[in-house]
Curated annotation (Swiss-Prot):
It is found in: Cytoplasm. Substrate binds at R27, Q28, A29, G30, R31, D77, Y154, T209, H327. This is Uroporphyrinogen decarboxylase. Pathway: Porphyrin-containing compound metabolism; protoporphyrin-IX biosynthesis; coproporphyrinogen-III from 5-aminolevulinate: step 4/4. GO terms for molecular function: uroporphyrinogen decarboxylase activity.
Length: 354
């Protein structure tokens, strides 16, 4: 494989010295970029874009042509795994993802296959290989998956949810069925991420978008336990380099200590967690990624820079910080404001690495 020219992101995740704080943005390949909208229109629809390796590669690289980002993230969707299990994923205008055959009971769980990453999910691996080739070693490529709990919410609710009553009903009335589903998902995600690593992903991230809707006890049993199983099963070295793993539970700032015990390399923070407090609590065990409020990108450039400076000062001197937003970039943000953000992180962070 090509020598990596910029390994700042990987070094920061492993709490090794860097010259400036590395930065990337969740959903950096997305609808705020006019060029993304053009490519998506060419593909026809969202899943066709995900399933075409050349087009998925194109949208992955688009933000890197605009901004000096320190990592690329595979363009895909967390729902590829449930889709490959045969639940019939489709997108309803204005409603987001839906499944034609949601999981309602243990019998449904028993029928679900564990997808072969090189078969049903082969299009994702083709995209990873294509992107790695086209990156030419400029920056590392991040692979990712949804967490078992987060995937289960979509599979049981039949799509997006605000109250999560359907899955919580299963959790409390039929916990055995939910544990069986989560166990199958943990096995599927482990295979899926390991296949991404073998195909060329140089770091991986597990997105637990909905872990924060659980009580502390339920989070441990129904979300964190299964992420821990995945971390235990991941390839941690490939191509002679360590493959760092980041866990991100949105709304999970109160559980950082428990998350750091999983053996992951880094934790993602949303904007509701104070990064100085997070570093005091777990900074001796894991790197931290985050955590500017994505809505800050609506602010004037001077205010964006001020917020970047505040977060950098909060983390302080030394290693182990990857700058990011606290969740995905919003689709109506001005691309120029994203540029201000990235430039400010590099310029203002230099003093913390001397």
């Amino acid at each position: 494989m090509t020598e990596l020219k910029n390994d700042r992101y990987l070094r920061a995740l492993l709490r090794q010295p860097v010259d400036v704080t590395p930065v990337w943005m969740m959903r950096q390949a997305g609808r705020y970029l006019p060029e993304y909208k053009a490519t998506r229109a060419q593909a026809g629809d969202f899943m066709s874009l995900c399933k075409n390796a050349e087009l998925a590669c194109e949208v992955t690289l688009q933000p890197l042509r605009r901004y000096p980002l320190d990592a690329a993230i595979l363009f895909s969707d967390i729902l590829t795994v449930p889709d490959a299990m045969g639940l019939g994923l489709y997108f309803e205008a204005g409603e987001g993802p839906r499944f034609t055959s949601p999981v309602t009971c243990k019998a449904d769980v028993d029928k679900l296959p564990i997808p072969d990453p090189e078969d049903e999910l082969g299009y994702v691996m083709n995209a990873v290989r294509t992107i790695r080739r086209e990156l030419k070693g400029e920056v590392p490529l991040i692979g990712f998956s949804g967490s078992p709990w987060t995937l289960a919410t979509y599979m049981v609710e039949g799509g997006s949810s605000k109250a999560f009553t359907v899955i919580k009903k299963m959790m409390y009335a039929d916990p055995q069925a939910l544990h069986a589903l989560l166990d199958k998902l943990a096995k599927s995600v482990t295979l899926y991420l390991n296949a991404q690593i073998k195909a060329g992903a140089q770091a991986v991230m597990i997105f637990d978008t909905w872990g924060g809707v659980l009580t502390g006890r339920d989070y441990q049993q129904f979300s964190l336990y299964y992420m821990h199983k995945i971390v235990d099963g991941l390839l941690r070295e490939n191509d002679g380099r360590r493959v760092p793993v980041t866990l991100f539970t949105k709304g999970g700032g109160q559980w950082l200590e428990a998350m750091a015990e999983t053996g992951c390399d880094a934790l993602g923070l949303d904007w509701t967690t104070d990064i100085a407090d997070a570093r005091r609590r777990v900074g001796n065990k894991v790197a931290l990624q985050g955590n500017m409020d994505p809505s800050m990108l609506y602010a004037p450039p001077a205010r964006i820079e001020e917020e970047v400076a505040t977060i950098l000062a909060g983390f302080g001197h030394g290693e182990g910080h990857v700058f990011n937003l606290g969740h995905g970039i919003h689709q109506d943000v001005l691309p120029e404001h994203a540029g201000v953000f990235v430039e400010a992180v590099h310029r203002l962070s230099e003093q913390y690495h001397r």
